[in-house]
Amino acid sequence: MDNYTYSELLKSLQNKCDNIALIIKPEKIKQELERIEKEQEDPNFWQDVLKARDTNKEKVRLNRLLETYQKTKNSLDESVELFELAQNDNDETTLSLLYEEAPTLEHSVQKVEIEIMLSGENDASNAIITIQPGAGGTESQDWASILYRMYLRWAERRGFKSEILDYQDGEEAGIKGVAFIIKGENAYGYLKNENGVHRLVRISPFDANAKRHTSFASVQISPELDDDIDIEIDEKDVRYDYYRASGAGGQHVNKTESAVRITHFPTGIVVQCQNDRSQHKNKASALKMLKSKLYELELEKQQSSAKNEEKSEIGWGHQIRSYVLAPYQQVKDARSNIAYSNVEAILDGDIDAILEGVLIAKA
């Protein structure tokens, strides 16, 4: 990097920071935080528990956004000042240090941009994830289990919690399907763009001839809805099936028909849960999954209508990302059009760069 390149980078980052300020309006955030603090001082604040909870959530979000913005702006202003002084004094040591820190400065501005992008209605929610293997038997079932582990490892890296709702072992390896919740700040906001088909190309560990195989798995993401969001489901539109649990989460198998499957006829959505020994609890969890999927479906329809587009199909034709392990190693996302070479780390849950790249591409 040279003086001109760094100077242009600073101009670009300053422009982005100015645009961010126009969007988030820091002074208005400060005023809103003052208003919330006064509201919290009211002795009657906790009488409406749901409202109080939402207010606290908003306070945390605004504080985090303001703190991230101010920290980034201060770092940028300091870098601009140091750069001018170093240029005037021909201070090569300081210039070299600034060049080295440029990627960190650039990433900090990007972090504020991501914070803004995660301010949607459901972005702060927990995420319900369903993974289904495509055609191909053991190959696809194994690929589905690899994706499942990838998301669990991502959650662990962030300190998020996870909870299995439904898990079906594959016949030889992998899984026939899994549904689980990732619980953490902005879990849905980060993962919402994972909806679609994930493609794997590799030398099959199940093929004695060591041939290259292509496998597919479908990932569906929906927000875990708060209890105060009411989604009405007509009983005549659904069918409940009860069966004996099997696989992980259902080690008490073949004793009681505690597992629950719900089919929603108007949409064709099928959800199932076998995580708990209690049929009642499994039914409640399955209903929560169904309501979340119906809510997500309605949001997609509204967004498509607003853009005057047809609803994008989340099916086997909607491929969002390819993971190639042979003959070369590369993960490429179809939305951001960015390719990544750290395939092993990605499959171990290091997917922040991919998720953020898609958020920025779709902004």
UniProtKB/Swiss-Prot annotation:
InterPro entries associated with the record: PCRF (IPR005139), Pep_chain_release_fac_I (IPR000352), Pep_chain_release_fac_I_sf (IPR045853), PrfB (IPR004374)
Subcellular location: Cytoplasm
Residues annotated as signal peptide: none
PTM per Swiss-Prot/TrEMBL: Methylated by PrmC. Methylation increases the termination efficiency of RF2.
Pfam families: PCRF, RF-1
Modified residues annotated as N5-methylglutamine in this record: 251
Keywords linked to the UniProt accession: Cytoplasm, Methylation, Protein biosynthesis
GO CC term (a single one): cytoplasm
Gene3D superfamilies: 3.30.160.20, 3.30.70.1660, Release factor
UniProt xrefs under SMART domains: PCRF
Recorded family membership: Belongs to the prokaryotic/mitochondrial release factor family.
Function of the protein: Peptide chain release factor 2 directs the termination of translation in response to the peptide chain termination codons UGA and UAA.
Name of the featured protein: Peptide chain release factor 2
Organism: Helicobacter pylori (strain G27)
Gene: prfB
